Swiss-Prot record:
InterPro entries: At4g02110-like, BRCT_dom, BRCT_dom_sf. Signal peptide: none annotated. Residues 295-378, 393-470, 576-645, 745-827, 952-1077 are annotated as: Disordered. Keywords: Repeat. Residues 986-1004 have a biased composition (Low complexity). Residues 7-97, 104-194, 1090-1181 form the BRCT domain. Residues 410-422, 600-611, 818-827, 971-983, 1024-1047 have a biased composition (Basic and acidic residues). This is BRCT domain-containing protein At4g02110. Pfam families: BRCT, PTCB-BRCT. CDD domains: BRCT_PAXIP1_rpt3, BRCT_PAXIP1_rpt4, BRCT_TopBP1_rpt7. It comes from Arabidopsis thaliana (Mouse-ear cress). It comes from the Eukaryota.
């Protein structure tokens, strides 16, 4: 269980710290984090402390020198903050946490202006931090006359091309920064004029000569080439008689073949952003891999040595470069199904996962450390069960306990040694890979496999892992020909079986293949692998039949060339050799290089491996994620719902759940009409589906993107077969609402914080009524004399229930709202499923109301603005419910009356409303969605009202109660059922005769009195008194019914496009048809979106330097605001963007497109002084003219915010585009997030585009330099789709009002103007979500 801050309880366990040099405020902040995480404050620096944490002290300060000499850890305060962020102790040896040698920076660094290109994620932030530590300046844009150094990962892109033409700009890789900081001087750039990508290729192709072929190298996995985060190990040096330097050759075993090749880019002609496609035919995926995950070097960690009979020395510069891990934005791919790829597991084993619906591969890198040193382990797992799992080196399954190769016996001083003796040793597990059978070269492919022992013989702690008994049994006389494996990040093993092996047996049972390889001492020419008694070994391993036959055949097939994920299903044949990319280095395996060995297979049932739940060690590119965040929540995959880890939000097949955030006493009720077995099955299903999503950021949990919440809350499956012998009438007559609900027999339950509910069971008639209500301010349903008081914000509500008659209820309520109080603006998520009694309620503040209609009971309670009138004629079996809402006593001399009458599918509704003269106060209503065909009703947005009802009969009535009343009527064999469900935002009252309630909202007080009533039904009059200038009631209810598709979309404030998952088959129409089918209360209505100052959370995203961001985030949290995950990427839940200056960044682009508040930093400072979050408008970035660089029209932030307030949608609402070619500025990921934030849609990012060659596609975004005669360009032109550059959209958002013609390609200006006009019309379109 984690705290609200996301910090595990014992992050700093064992840390005895002393703080030196801090100011009181900063020191107290760090001390609080340390103590809360289990650290112990020892006060002054003494020998008892383990960590000396300093600020503004130099590296050579006497206290720092004394601490280092005594073996203490000396770090800066950043180490505490970063460890706090990731939930575990960060690497204290990182250069980022080392005290400076001079507070003024490295001599001569003041003139440095550094820019970067090719790095992503937290790599960028750490490079910026290193520049800051050096004393230089960092510039995000490459300003030709200012920038002095460009840090390149790859020598490509616009920045590189510009820098190459300007001789004064030095092109270096990031290791230059690191080495400068280590040596505290500016080093010559000539040694670093090689890109990170070229270093990758160099290392991947580096092989030792045949003389050193038996020397196995240990390349530290999962570490950073920048030497910043995870345990650092310097370059490997091998001494050779004569001391001559020799170059790395192809075939050398010094470098880790498998890791390098596994990350080798497949192609270089397109960036990785362009490899994402939503097209079903080209489900290309991408994954971002940080270069920091593989090699990290710091002198403190010691030196990895490899000793041969002699001693050999490698050129340190080459080796240093070659240790750089592969880091490519262009190749690694992410699965759109789960979007969990590339995220580290929450453990010391950080794994890079590739997910496909078929085979899954997981490469886990283990770093285990002991006092004697640290060792690196890596295992390769291949899974096909649709689950993502990790295999920890310490936690191999019982079936193979000896698979723990090393146990921390690598000495930091002596490091890893491989000796030429009679006892063979295992190469590092990082070389374990499935391999391909190559019978054409038996001399290279056949290798002896001997007993497995510990490869390390450390002088300090030279203990050995026990020799595996199982592996001894596995050694036999059978020949196992193998060849080296090449693996790429975008490729998964495929075609691993032979024709005679059934496909099913391999794909279902060969769930894990761990290739254990061991070298045999002696001649490298000896290439026969013997495996004894494979049948017995297979029996002990509980192998599947096909796997046993595979072993019995005497040959284990391996495959080196790997298939892409979309093709990575085991086809049961090795009948084709996958084509190799030009950039895949062709490796020749030396006779004793790592890679061969035995396959261990497990049965299907044993794929669940125990793993430790710990946060990953930090590395560049991975820092700052407390858990596994969902990257790119704004998935462009239209056919796939966004992932979530909120299992309690999903309702399927009898599962009833209702999360109400902010309330710890959440309860989950399964109604008796539900099938408990189905509930269990669904729970298991959800567990499986969300296994990789357990650690989503807490802010993301609470407020996901609107489209995502739409899928989460509304994944409702109609379960008619499970209604257990209920007649259609009974099924239709019973509606269950479950929020914080328990089964009670005439016993009321009160919950002052989130509401109360009462459940009644009539045992005599076997009828059940269930009512649930959750109100933002209060909700009371109770027995005689029960009362409570609840405070929400400044509102205080006291309600008293006095008495009640079973069949007679009359309610008369009056509600007064202050003009300055917007408490009635927020809407909540509410879902009612009529057919099988399921309810899901999601969101920060859920408001749920409903009732159970029984067949013979005439009394009911209805929590609503207006109580409902229920008349039951038991003789005729008719049931009718009518609702009338009357708003009177308006503080204005004129009254507007409106009657709305519509026919939908043969249903009539009459609604009479008296309204305020202020049109807005009664015109704009909230969407209520009714899915008549599939029983699915959905709501978009963090706060919205959803009423779901499944009608079993053909006749269904959906009526537009434009003033907060909805009436549904249907006739089923003389059984008429009317239902009204209305929710009152500020207070909900459903009480008994004579009950009274006093509500105070702001300074206004309201007296509610319940009076008796004649007859057997309920009659209600709800009187609402409002200030004339009050905007709090401007959001009411609006019903949009799409009869063509039997689907009604209801959207919240954050998203205009509602996409729902329909359980039953339903007719679907085009988007234009759906839009044209929307019904509006008033064609003149203009939607106004107001944030509820008291109740609706504000989500802030901050820009600027890290220290400033951290400070602002702390202030915002103290003022009860919420902060989005700290990242340079846009977060969809953000409502406010705090920017110290306006620049054309992703955050600004997405914030403007979404219509969010873009505020100056003064807003935070003044809010801090005021002790509360102030009104935003005085602090909004808004002016006339352009910004200093001419990239932004200063009127754009306010323009698009007003568009959202007026219409409810973003700047790109309804936009449908395809992307063709490379997207560099902005990158594709940025473009996707911004377009999604602006409520647009990217249809596809790679060919084929056949499905989208129609008039509904507004633009085709083309990469610069694409020739006109390209086949797809011709297709776009033939279908009159305008072709534009990506800057067209950027400037449309950032520079509204300025000409865009210069960004139009191939003379498609007339078509572009037509699409532009469509966007302008949509901008004025009032959309009701």
């Amino acid at each position: 269980m984690q705290s609200d801050s996301g910090l595990p309880p014992k992050t700093y366990s064992g840390v005895k710290f002393a703080l030196v040099g801090f100011n009181p405020i900063h020191g107290n902040s760090l001390r609080s984090k340390l103590v809360s995480g289990g650290g112990v404050d020892v006060g002054q620096f003494t020998q008892s402390c383990t960590h000396l944490i300093v600020d503004k002290l130099l590296y050579d300060d006497p206290i720092c020198v004394a601490a280092r000499n005594s073996g203490k850890v000396v770090v800066t305060g950043s180490w505490v903050d970063h460890s706090f962020d990731i939930g575990m102790l960060d690497n204290a040896n990182s250069i980022l946490y080392r005290p400076l040698r001079d507070l003024n920076g490295i001599p001569g660094s003041k003139a440095l202006v550094v820019c970067l290109t090719g790095y992503q994620g937290h790599d960028r932030e750490d490079i910026m931090r290193m520049v800051e530590l050096m004393g230089g300046q960092f510039s995000k844009p490459l300003v030709a006359n200012r920038v002095t150094h460009l840090i390149c990962y790859k020598f490509e892109g616009e920045k590189y091309e510009l820098a190459k033409r300007i001789k004064r700009i030095k092109l270096v890789n990031h290791r230059w920064l690191e080495d400068c900081l280590k040596n505290w001087k500016l080093l010559p750039e000539v040694d670093y004029e090689i890109s990170g990508y070229e270093l990758d290729i160099m290392e991947a192709s580096a092989r030792d000569s045949e003389d050193e072929a038996e020397d196995a190298s240990v390349k530290p996995a999962n570490t950073s080439p920048l030497g910043l985060r995870v345990g650092a190990v310097p370059a490997v040096e091998i001494s050779k008689p004569g001391g001559k330097d020799f170059p790395l050759e192809e075939g050398s075993s010094l470098c880790n073949t498998s890791k390098d090749n596994w990350l080798t880019p497949k192609r270089t002609d397109r960036p990785f952003e362009a490899m994402v496609s939503t097209d079903l035919g080209v489900a290309q995926q991408h994954n971002y891999v940080s270069p920091i995950r593989v090699a990290n070097k710091t002198p403190e960690q010691g030196m990895s040595k490899m000793e041969t009979d002699g001693s050999t020395s490698i050129n340190r510069s080459i080796r240093r470069h070659s240790s750089l891990a592969t880091y490519s934005r262009k190749t690694l791919q992410r699965s759109p199904e789960t979007d969990t790829l590339g995220k580290e597991s929450s453990g010391q084993n950080r794994s890079l996962r590739m997910d496909d619906k078929g085979l899954k591969a997981s490469s886990a890198f283990n770093t285990s450390a002991s006092k004697s040193g640290s060792s690196m382990e890596r295992t390769s797992l291949f899974r096909d069960l649709g689950k993502i799992d990790m295999l920890h080196g310490e936690e191999f399954p019982p079936m193979m306990p000896q698979a723990k190769f090393t146990d921390g016996s690598v000495s930091r001083k002596d490091s890893l040694r491989v000796h030429h003796n009679s006892e063979a040793s295992i190469p590092p597990p990082s070389s374990l890979l499935l391999q391909e059978l190559r019978p054409s070269s038996p001399n290279d492919n056949l290798r002896p496999v001997m007993s497995i022992s510990d490869p390390t013989e450390s002088e300090e702690a030279g203990h050995k892992s026990p020799t595996s008994e199982l592996n001894t049994k596995l050694l036999s006389s059978n020949v196992v020909p193998m060849v080296d494996a090449l693996s790429t990040a975008e490729n998964i093993i495929s075609n691993c079986a032979w024709d005679e092996i059934p496909e099913k047996s391999l794909t279902e049972r060969m769930t894990e293949n761990v290739l254990l390889q061991e070298q045999r001492s002696g001649s490298p020419k000896q290439n026969l692998s013997v495996v004894p008694n494979l049948r017995e070994a297979a029996h002990e391993l509980d192998l599947s039949d096909s796997a046993a036959r595979l072993f019995n055949s005497g040959v284990v097939p391996m495959e080196a060339d790997i298939r892409t994920p979309e093709n990575s299903t085991m086809k049961g044949a090795l009948d084709e050799v996958p084509e190799r990319s030009v950039t895949d280095p062709v490796m020749r395996r030396s006779s004793t290089s790592p890679g061969s060995g035995l396959i261990r297979m497990k049965d299907k049932q044993e794929t669940e491996l125990t793993t430790k739940k710990t946060a990953p060690k930090k590395s560049l590119g991975t820092r700052g994620r407390k858990k596994n965040p969902i990257n790119q929540k704004g998935s462009i995959y239209l056919s796939e719902p966004s992932p979530t880890d909120e299992r309690n939000v999903c309702l399927n097949k009898g599962k009833v759940s209702a999360p109400v955030t902010g309330n710890s006493n959440q309860k989950e009720i399964s109604s008796p009409v539900l099938n408990t077995e189905v509930v269990q099955d669904m729970a298991k299903h959800i567990d499986t589906e969300t296994e990789a999503l357990q650690g989503i950021d807490s802010v993301d949990n609470k407020s996901l993107a609107p489209e995502e919440k739409d899928h989460l809350v509304l994944d409702l499956m109609v379960n008619q077969d499970k209604l257990q012998a209920k007649t259609p009438e009974a099924a239709d007559a019973e509606v269950e609402i479950t929020v914080l609900e328990r089964e009670l027999n005439d016993v009321p339950t009160e919950d002052p914080s989130d509401g109360a509910l009462q459940s009644e069971v009539d045992k005599n008639t076997s009828k059940r009524k269930r009512e649930a209500g959750v109100g933002k301010n209060s909700l009371q349903r109770g027995k005689k004399g029960s009362s409570f008081t609840a405070k929400v914000g400044k509102s205080r509500v006291k309600k008293t229930k006095i008495s009640r008659k079973e069949n007679d209820i009359k309610a008369n309520g009056t509600l007064m709202k202050d003009g300055g109080d917007n408490s009635a603006d927020g809407k909540e998520n509410l879902a009612l499923e009529h057919e099988n009694g399921k309810v899901s309620s999601g969101g920060d503040q859920s408001l749920v109301a409903g009732e159970t209609l029984t067949r013979k009971e005439a009394a009911t309670k209805d929590p609503s603005y207006a109580a409902a009138q229920l008349e039951v004629d038991t003789k005729k079996g008719k049931r009718r419910k009518q609702a009338t809402v009357e708003e009177n006593r308006l503080q204005t001399p004129s009254v507007k009356k409106a009657k709305v009458s519509k026919k939908e599918d043969g249903a009539k509704a009459n609604n009479t409303v008296k309204k305020d003269i202020w049109i807005h106060s009664a015109e704009v209503k909230e969407n209520v969605a009714v899915d008549e065909n599939c029983g699915d009703v959905s709501s978009d947005g963090a706060q919205s009202l959803v009423v779901e009802k499944s009608l079993a009969k053909k006749e269904a009535a959906a009526k537009d109660p434009s003033n907060a009343a909805m009436q549904l009527e249907f006739d089923d064999n003389k059984c008429k059922h009317g239902k009204e469900g209305i929710v009152e935002r500020s207070s909900l009252q459903s009480g008994k005769k004579g009950s009274s309630s006093r509500v105070e909202v702001g300074k206004s007080s309201v007296k509610k009195t319940k009076k008796s009533e004649k007859g057997s039904g309920t009659e209600a009059t709800d009187t609402v008194m409002k200030d004339v200038g009050d905007n709090s009631a401007k959001e009411k209810e609006n019903i949009a019914v799409d009869n063509e598709s039997r689907k009604v979309g209801s959207g919240g404030d954050q998203s205009p496009v509602a996409r729902k998952k329909v359980a039953k088959s339903a007719k679907t129409g085009t988007k234009a048809e759906k839009e044209s089918k929307q019904l509006r209360v008033n064609p003149l209505a203009s939607r106004k979106v107001f944030q509820d100052q008291e109740h609706e959370p504000k989500f802030f995203i901050v820009s600027g330097p890290r220290s400033q961001r951290n400070e602002y985030q702390q202030i915002i949290r103290r003022l009860k605001g919420k902060c989005c995950r700290d990242s340079h990427q846009w977060s969809y839940q953000a409502t406010h963007f705090i920017a110290p200056e306006i620049r054309r960044t992703e955050k600004f682009f997405a914030a403007a497109a979404s219509g969010s508040w873009i505020l100056k930093t003064d807003y935070v400072a003044d809010s801090k002084e005021a002790g509360k979050l102030l009104q935003e408008e005085p602090y909004e970035w808004h002016s006339s003219g352009l910004s200093a660089d001419g990239a932004i029209n200063l009127e754009s932030p306010k323009k698009w915010r007003l568009v959202r307030e007026k219409t409810g949608h973003g700047a790109l609402y309804g936009l449908r585009i395809v992307v063709y070619g490379d997207c560099t500025i902005p990158c594709l990921d940025t473009l996707k997030r911004a377009v999604k934030a602006g409520d647009g849609t990217i249809l596809a990012t790679a060919p084929p585009y056949t499905r989208f060659l129609n008039q509904n596609t507004d633009f085709a975004l083309i990469s610069p330099g694409m020739p006109r005669d390209d086949v797809w360009i011709q297709e776009f032109i033939r279908h009159e789709i305008p072709c534009v550059l990506s800057d067209y959209l950027v400037e449309y958002v950032c520079k509204p009002g300025y000409a865009l013609d210069k960004h139009v390609l191939y003379n498609t200006n007339s078509w572009a103007e037509k699409s532009f006009n469509k966007m302008q019309l949509r901008a004025d379109l009032c959309v009701y979500h």
